[in-house]
């Protein structure tokens, strides 16, 4: 649901600023690269402007070559807010259009925008985007035309003043992560359409003149889809938050202008398969392989969401005739789609045939992947920890430099209550401190917040969500309890975040005092080790040093996690004690929503999920908080799954069926409410796509059906809210998932 008020914009210092900044930074882009960039040149319609535009307009819709190196006369167009000043001036300080320009100039990026005519009130703006269909120049041009029509359809509230803008030019830049080059499409209105490549050296070339132009567009399309999916998946723990506020995030599954996006991605996968490692891999993977990279992660996520298992299975089995390791991807898909019998059978077949199946240089790496999948299944689904331990140990032997096998082995020792071995294995995990999750980063720096145009989407109003004042929230953040705000464990990243989660599972079993005893029994601290070394050099009796020699040196990062755990436990205990006292006195808890949020996150990190959920509920009872809502939604989904599992357990006869039904109904209502509110909040901040919301709502839809869920929302919320949820969530299940998994 894109409207004028749902498009964030940044005012440029001069027209072409954002494109030029992007061109300068092309050599710095790594792996998946930046978000797509959209730039606009807007002007105030006057008779002189209209004549100027018409006199330079070309053949509308024609496809032209890349900007030539011998362009037209030099001019610089700078931004202006006033409606009564023509502000085009000649200069060489900014966006240059010169007869003697080289490929490295800004001109090829800016592409001579009516250089000989002064347009009144002209202003350059830009914003970032994700999820746009980049399968070809036509689909991009259709999207750009939609954006320009939205901008010009009615007067725009521009920094407090209503202005009627026309769009002279609109451009789209997207990163082809496989070739490390930028793909540009520029639409002149009225006039021509240009599409060209700009490589890391600043050289530009027309795409259509290349023999491999179809492959280039296929790579560009896949790059865009992978970015959209991985942005959400990699930041799921952080609530899919991203700090680049001037970004319009669309649903890549429903943004297709010509073809079905999920089907197209699956069909193109074999063509791009061998290039997958060039995209990089999640933060916990050290050695990127054909089956362990962002491309594969995206395919698995797409099939899981759309339930396109049959199409993916046919494609992967065909691919496996020449690339046997591709079966590993199919096993991953079977596991996430609850086809566990098929997955385990395939895993067994591949492991039993060994090198006959996978005859590659990375045989041990692929074997380790299979063993990890098998061990994870035994731990999570079968609770066969003894067998899981043997398999995880074999996975470590196959890939000793990978984090995941060590992590699984440590996890299975925790399940076996073998705390000493769990800690020793955790201490041995190969950490990756420099590898980060995929996040969006600003390509064109903001020189001032005054250049940000962040309209409030007024097409959807849900008072408790959309009326929230960001300044009030910031004030609340500043006055929150410093003890909660400064908890360093909340800032843990990458593999350290996973290691901390294991440590909290251990302390739940042992308690803090016993954990310290385990630590002192098996580890020697770094300062203790240094002191013992100096003692030996001074001739201290070696027999006194024997106990130290039997211990392992505790890694500094693990020692730091112990300290962070102590801080979390201390704060949690203090807050719990205070709450119990207040409850006993029948007094109200005088806490801020932000404080409830921080306490809930602390409790969640420590594995106290019911207490965390209660804290999030307390916070939401005072005002809306997107983080509280997301974490409470996660709890409701997990609690619903727990109840479902309990129904099928031998102890289920102790629970009255009516009680089970009532609990499931209560959780379903909470899930629907939270999904709707988070969807409205996302729309407020220009985000129309969320994997976590699709995942959460799918659980309810599978039981209730699409029509009933839609009716539930319709009965509780205004029509505009229903329309938003329909477009952003429900239409996905209706139009994209057409294989009967989600009945109406």
Predicted features along the sequence, with ranges:
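Non-TPR docking regions that flank or precede TPR/alpha-solenoid scaffolds in eukaryotic proteins
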Residues: 1-744
């Amino acid at each position: 649901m894109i409207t004028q008020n749902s498009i964030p914009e940044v005012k440029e210092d001069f027209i072409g600023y954002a494109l030029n900044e992007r061109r300068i930074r092309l050599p710095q882009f790594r792996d998946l690269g930046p978000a797509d960039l959209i730039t606009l040149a807007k002007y105030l319609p006057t008779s002189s402007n209209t004549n100027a535009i018409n006199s330079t307009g070309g053949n509308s819709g024609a496809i032209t070559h890349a900007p030539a190196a011998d362009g037209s006369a030099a001019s610089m167009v700078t931004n202006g807010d006033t409606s009564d000043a023509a502000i085009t001036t000649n200069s060489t300080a900014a966006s240059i259009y010169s007869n003697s320009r080289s490929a490295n100039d800004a001109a090829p990026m800016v592409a001579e925008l009516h250089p000989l005519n002064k347009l009144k009130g002209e202003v350059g703006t830009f914003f970032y985007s994700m999820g746009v269909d980049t399968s070809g120049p036509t689909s991009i041009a259709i999207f750009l035309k939609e954006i320009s029509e939205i901008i010009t359809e009615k007067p725009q509230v521009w920094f407090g003043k209503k202005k009627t803008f026309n769009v002279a030019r609109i451009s789209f830049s997207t990163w082809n992560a496989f070739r490390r080059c930028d793909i540009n499409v520029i639409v002149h209105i009225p006039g021509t359409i240009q599409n060209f490549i700009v490589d890391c050296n600043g050289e530009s070339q027309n795409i259509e003149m290349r023999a491999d132009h179809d492959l280039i567009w296929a790579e560009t399309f896949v790059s865009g889809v992978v970015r959209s999916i991985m942005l959400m998946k990699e930041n799921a723990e952080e609530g899919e938050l991203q700090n680049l506020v001037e970004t319009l995030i669309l649903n890549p599954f429903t943004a297709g202008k010509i073809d079905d996006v999920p089907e197209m991605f699956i069909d193109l996968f074999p063509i791009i398969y061998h290039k997958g490692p060039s995209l990089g891999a999640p933060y916990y993977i050290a050695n990127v392989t054909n089956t362990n990279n962002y491309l594969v992660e995206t395919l698995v996520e797409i099939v899981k969401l759309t339930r396109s298992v049959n199409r993916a299975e046919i494609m992967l089995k065909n691919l496996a005739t020449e690339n046997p390791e591709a079966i590993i991807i199919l096993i991953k898909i079977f596991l996430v789609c609850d086809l566990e019998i098929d997955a385990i059978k395939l895993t067994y077949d591949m492991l039993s045939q060994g090198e006959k199946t996978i005859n590659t240089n990375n045989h041990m790496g692929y074997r380790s992947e299979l063993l990890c999948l098998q061990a994870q299944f035994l731990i999570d689904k079968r609770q066969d920890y003894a067998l899981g331990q043997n398999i995880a140990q074999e996975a470590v032997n196959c890939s000793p430099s990978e984090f995941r096998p060590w992590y699984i082995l440590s996890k299975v020792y925790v399940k076996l209550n073998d705390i000493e071995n769990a800690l020793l294995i955790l201490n041995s995990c190969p950490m990756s401190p420099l590898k980060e999750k995929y996040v969006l980063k600003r390509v064109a720096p903001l020189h001032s917040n005054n250049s940000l145009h962040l309209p409030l989407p007024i097409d959807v109003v849900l008072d408790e969500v959309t009326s929230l004042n960001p300044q009030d929230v910031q004030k609340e953040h500043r006055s929150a309890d410093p003890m909660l705000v400064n908890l360093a464990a909340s800032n843990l990243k990458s593999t350290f975040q996973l290691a901390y989660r294991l440590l909290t599972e251990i302390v739940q079993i042992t308690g803090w005092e016993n954990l310290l005893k385990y630590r002192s029994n098996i580890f020697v601290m770094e300062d203790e080790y240094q002191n013992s070394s100096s003692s030996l050099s001074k001739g201290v009796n070696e027999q006194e040093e024997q106990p130290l020699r039997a211990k392992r040196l505790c890694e500094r990062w693990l020692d730091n996690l112990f300290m962070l755990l102590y801080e979390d436990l201390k704060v949690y205990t203090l807050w719990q004690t205070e709450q119990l006292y207040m409850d006993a006195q029948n007094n109200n808890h005088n806490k801020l929503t932000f404080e409830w949020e921080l306490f809930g996150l602390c409790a969640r990190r420590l594995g106290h999920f019911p207490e965390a959920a209660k804290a999030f509920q307390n916070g939401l009872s005072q005002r809306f908080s997107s983080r509280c809502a997301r974490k409470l939604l996660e709890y409701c989904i997990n609690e619903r799954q727990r109840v479902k599992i309990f129904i099928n357990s031998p102890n289920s006869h102790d629970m009255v069926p009516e009680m089970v039904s009532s609990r499931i109904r209560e959780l379903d209502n909470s899930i629907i409410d939270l999904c709707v509110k988070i969807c409205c909040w996302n729309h407020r901040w220009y985000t129309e796509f969320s994997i976590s919301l699709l995942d959460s709502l799918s659980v309810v839809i599978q039981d209730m059906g699409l029509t009933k869920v839609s009716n539930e929302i319709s009965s509780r919320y205004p029509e505009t809210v229903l329309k938003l949820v329909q477009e952003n969530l429900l239409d996905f299940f209706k139009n994209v998932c057409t294989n009967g998994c989600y009945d109406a």
